[in-house]
Amino acid sequence: MSLPKGLKNYVIITKTPLRITFGGGGSDMASYYLRYPSTCISATINKYVYVLVRKRFDDKIYLKYSDNEVVDIQHIDDIQHDFIRETLKFMNVSYGIEIINWADIPTRGTGLGSSSSFLVGLLLALHTLEGRYVSKEALAAQACYIEIDKCKKPIGIQDQYAAAFGGFNQMEFGSNIRKGDYKEISGFGFCDQEIRNISEHLHLFYTGVTRESKDILSAQKENLISDQEIVSNMHKNVEIANKLAECLTHKDISSIPITLRQNWELKKKFAGDISNPELDRIYDVATTIGGAEAGKILGAGGGGFFLFWANDKKKLKEALADYQELPFLIDKYGTRVVLNLEQLSW
């Protein structure tokens, strides 16, 4: 079987980081940033989503993720995994292919941006398989298009840009006459030692609760359109993120716990299910008994991972002994190809 023009007879594996957020989350939804300037602060971490793709000898699509699927290439619309289905259609894939996905941690409902990381990694793998260079900005934009426009997910756009670019960044999104719709990504220029210092203060704990972000984000999306009080709170959220960005530009990390605390209090007002009594209890235990200066739930809310800022890791771990800690470091890089191996000819 001859390969389509440009298609490599290779095995490709991509590695794409998950992310944590510090401020501005929610302002990256189109219902906000197309009307008002948005700022988000996030960092990628050394926990990854992996995607393997390879050309098959036949005309079938083999998928292995938390489920398995086998579909004829002529029946691509029968694929149940919406991200894979829409990505293959977007890329005009017309050949048999195998796609395998795995991750360092369970990713569903954790609040670490795993769905966007998977999508960015899948796009990079397919572009590489077809011998095509694609920029980080293009990867992020394509992932946003597939996830939001094609798969109709009620989400923002910071996760896709974080996964593509990697590092500790300020992301600004907006729309105006001078720039049109714009996305600007800028790092803070931290050296390795400064990154390690920040990482040593940050601690992730799993609440044991997974949730579908769709309902929470749908409510938040509607609130940003119809509820002026929510819009006003989002303005405050962006203002807090901008202040943090200014401090981080001057290497002042003391503002991080202040931002986490302020962000968590505002975040709980954006939709009804973002927090609950159990999450409030975890936060209280961490900040009173565990000595954490501040913290926030990551992602849409309702469960997943708490991010805490604390000086005494041992004290915090003892206070939250009933919850699983996820040790991590900040990752400086975005999605990348980690294996590009030529297969034997058929």
Protein language model features and the residues they cover:
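Short hydrophobic alpha-helical segments that form membrane-spanning helices or hydrophobic packing faces
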Residues: L123, F306-L307
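C-terminal nucleotide
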Residues: M1-G23, D28-L34, C40-S42, Y48-Y95, ...
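Short, surface-exposed acidic
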Residues: G96-I97, V134-A138
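N-terminal pre-triad scaffold of radical SAM enzymes
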Residues: I99-G111
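DPxDG-like acidic metal-binding loop motif
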Residues: G111-K136, A164
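Glycine-rich active-site/cofactor-binding loop and its immediate structural neighborhood
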Residues: G303
